[in-house]
Curated annotation (Swiss-Prot):
Pfam families: Cytochrom_B_C, Cytochrome_B
Positions with a binding annotation for heme b b566: 97, 196
Keyword Mitochondrion annotated: yes
Biological processes per GO annotation: mitochondrial electron transport, ubiquinol to cytochrome c
Note in the entry: Heme 1 (or BL or b562) is low-potential and absorbs at about 562 nm, and heme 2 (or BH or b566) is high-potential and absorbs at about 566 nm.
Protein name: Cytochrome b
Gene from which this protein is expressed: MT-CYB
């Protein structure tokens, strides 16, 4: 009798995706982040569902409903902090996952890469809308400033902002629609993640060497399922450490103050995972220019397949490219740090230099270095 996992129409799909999937034998721990992102998404959907049972999206009660969750709901404080810090873990895994793709040349799998960039945009939109919901002081002003950026769009900008707000400021209508979108989008993300996997399994996984690995593949289960489980346990350990010991480490203290439209915080900033893009936005004195630079700082990922000039797939055997890749990583850390600093000298100048360096490395230096490496290898 043939095994049910190979014949049943539904179980067969799971079998081809997670059990009998031919996987390159040499993929490292950097390939764990895909499954960790799935794990993070499940945590966010489950905790978010329980939070939605108690949250009210009304300007008068939003802040108190979050307080009520933390004080009166059984383990409400745990659910709330798991959800808030789960977003941070999600973005840490996302940045590492994208970084792995850039380092090992995974962007040459065009469909998978482009769906991945769309996923990144969807996760960023979801996280932003979720940040607005507790209606703390920084939530409110962050929402006001970021949505107001759309007013930089010529001709329709102001109308567009008022349409998104549902009025003349971030109010009840804004909160209600953001809550609706914040609830729905994670399920859209889950669907996109399945499409991402579907495209990945059309070509098979990349591997650290960047070489074709058809002759050296092993089944996903038990080898990589155990490896992914270990990764999930390590992530869970780090995550629960953060949630139970320092739950407010990555948050903003201003969010413990209810939103006050009459009192602007001295320094408005988004969550830490948006700071690099926020710095790029602030570095350009022109509003429309800043918004375009902000969007392009993420959209630039779509250009990597076009900018790939090397005859080699991966950076594993390209020390010059590696050097500039790590300079780019250091630059992103610098941008993140500057985003959290006040808008004054020397932070403005450092931010502008780091922003120029970010685009220069990606658009000019990395392709040029790749061509130089080809020449040095006489390719």
């Amino acid at each position: 009798m043939t095994n049910i996992r190979k014949t049943h129409p539904l179980i067969k799909i799971v079998n081809h995706s997670f059990i009998d999937l031919p996987t390159p034998s040499n993929i490292s721990a950097w390939w764990n982040f895909g499954s960790l992102l799935g794990f993070c998404l499940i945590i966010q959907i489950v905790t978010g569902l329980f939070l939605a049972m108690h949250y009210t999206s009304d300007t008068m009660t939003a802040f108190s409903s979050v307080t009520h969750i933390c004080r009166d709901v059984n383990y409400g404080w745990l659910i709330r902090y798991m959800h808030a810090n789960g977003a941070s873990m999600f973005f840490i895994c996302l940045f590492l996952h994208v970084g792995r793709g850039l380092y090992y040349g995974s962007y040459t799998y065009l469909e998978t890469w482009n769906i991945g960039v769309i996923l990144l945009f969807a996760v960023m939109a979801t996280a932003f809308m979720g940040y607005v919901l507790p209606r703390g002081q920084m939530s409110f002003w962050g929402a006001t400033v970021i949505t107001n950026l759309l007013s930089a769009i010529p001709y329709i900008g102001t109308t567009l902002v008022e349409w998104i707000w549902g009025g003349f400021s971030v109010d009840k209508a804004t909160l209600t629609r953001f809550f609706a979108f914040h609830f729905v989008l994670p399920f859209v993300i889950a669907a996109l993640a399945m499409i991402h996997l579907l495209f990945l399994h059309e070509t098979g996984s990349n591997n650290p060497s960047g070489l074709v690995s058809d002759s050296d593949k092993i089944p996903f289960h038990p080898y990589f399922s155990i490896k992914d489980l270990l990764g999930a346990l390590i992530l869970l350990l780090a995550f629960m450490n953060l949630v139970l010991f320092t739950p407010d480490l990555l948050g903003d203290p201003d969010n413990y103050i209810p939103a006050n439209p009459l009192n602007t915080p001295p320094h408005i900033k988004p969550e830490w995972y948006f700071l690099f893009a926020y710095t790029i936005l602030r570095s350009i004195p022109n509003k429309l220019g800043g918004v375009l630079a902000l969007v392009f700082s993420i959209l630039i990922l779509m250009l990597f397949p076009i900018l790939h000039m090397s005859k080699q797939h991966s950076m594993m055997f390209r020390p010059l490219s590696q050097c500039f890749f790590w300079i780019l990583v250091a630059d992103l850390f610098t941008l993140t740090w500057i985003g959290g600093q006040p808008v004054e000298y020397p932070f403005i100048t450092i931010g502008q230099v780091a922003s120029i360096l970010y685009f220069t490395i990606i658009l000019i230096i990395l392709p040029s270095i790749s061509l130089l490496e080809n020449k040095l290898l006489k390719w």
